[in-house]
Amino acid sequence: MELQFLGTGAGQPAKQRNVSSLALKLLDEINEVWMFDCGEGTQRQILETTIKPRKIRKIFITHLHGDHIFGLPGFLSSRSFQASEEQTDLDIYGPIGIKTYVLTSLKVSGARVPYQIHFHEFDDKSLGKIMETDKFVVYAERLAHTIFCMGYRVVQKDLEGTLDAEALKAAGVPFGPLFGKIKNGQDVELEDGRLICAKDYISAPKKGKIITIIGDTRKTSASVKLAKDADVLVHESTYGKGDERIARNHGHSTNMQAAQIAHEAGAKRLLLNHVSARFLGRDCRQMEKDAATIFENVKMVQDLEEVII
């Protein structure tokens, strides 16, 4: 499981940072990639990665500001050509209005996509658990931005315990159907009368990962709720230390506020993104150091950076 940041800037493209988009790579888990936001130029950023567009099966939009959605029509059109050998349907999750935006853009431009797009739109009344599969659950809450904006919490369901094959061999259990029964939790009796208890040969379930992705927002308790005990919290950091007033006025957060959220939520790791173009390399390093005074395990991410979860 990996996160790859396709765009880490705020507002408009800059020389060092493109606008918002990140990919959650779940290739080992379900052979899919989930994208969060799709700002202008996202498909160009994807070309710099190993991501195959047809593997992107779900897109989660935080809100409808242009720096988070202007890349969608182009990406959806290009996905048609790049997925010509294997067309795969696509689910788009986001605030009410995302369906109208996408379909209008495709209609006006005369674009046709040879795959199905399934839209899932949300407002205040329909948030909470918004999606569930056999391996993942996704939750969403409203944040505190200048327009309706959502944050997402991706929860991997606990992984089944693994079978200790070597211990079974040592116990004289013949390889074959009995292994399968024990793996499924069944106790088995051997020919010599010994009872093999499945629980003695299966490890405890492994807790699944939690990834929280916070869209544009002021400091809010909703972010703490979404980030509770998260393995990774991705939080916007449009502004720096001392910019709290301007951040609040524009519906954004500072690096220090993001660190406070991570601390209050008990998150394990904080990744700062959505950085104003006025902050260059040295500034970003200082923002990271400042945030670390509140939450130590923090990193300011760069475009195309990959983070293993």
UniProtKB/Swiss-Prot annotation:
Q: Which keywords annotate this record?
A: Endonuclease, Hydrolase, Metal-binding, Nuclease, tRNA processing, Zinc
Residues binding Zn(2+) 1 are: 63, 65, 145, 216
User: What EC number is given for this enzyme?
Assistant: 3.1.26.11
Residues of the active site: 67 (proton acceptor)
Asked if the record carries the keyword Zinc, the reply is: yes
Q: Does the keyword Calcium apply?
A: no
Which reaction does this chain catalyze? Endonucleolytic cleavage of RNA, removing extra 3' nucleotides from tRNA precursor, generating 3' termini of tRNAs. A 3'-hydroxy group is left at the tRNA terminus and a 5'-phosphoryl group is left at the trailer molecule
Q: What class of enzyme is it?
A: hydrolase
A Pfam family it matches: Lactamase_B
**Out of the domains of life, which is the source?**
Bacteria
Query: How does the cofactor attach, per the note?
Result: Binds 2 Zn(2+) ions.
CDD domains from the xrefs?
Answer: RNaseZ_ZiPD-like_MBL-fold (cd07717)
Q: Name one GO molecular function term.
A: zinc ion binding
| Cofactor(s) needed for function | Zn(2+)
Q: Where does Zn(2+) 2 bind?
A: 67-68, 216, 274
Q: Which family does it belong to?
A: Belongs to the RNase Z family.
| NCBIfam families reported in the protein's UniProt record | PRK00055.1-3, RNase_Z
Q: How does it assemble?
A: Homodimer.
Q: What role does this protein play?
A: Zinc phosphodiesterase, which displays some tRNA 3'-processing endonuclease activity. Probably involved in tRNA maturation, by removing a 3'-trailer from precursor tRNA.
Name assigned to this protein: Ribonuclease Z
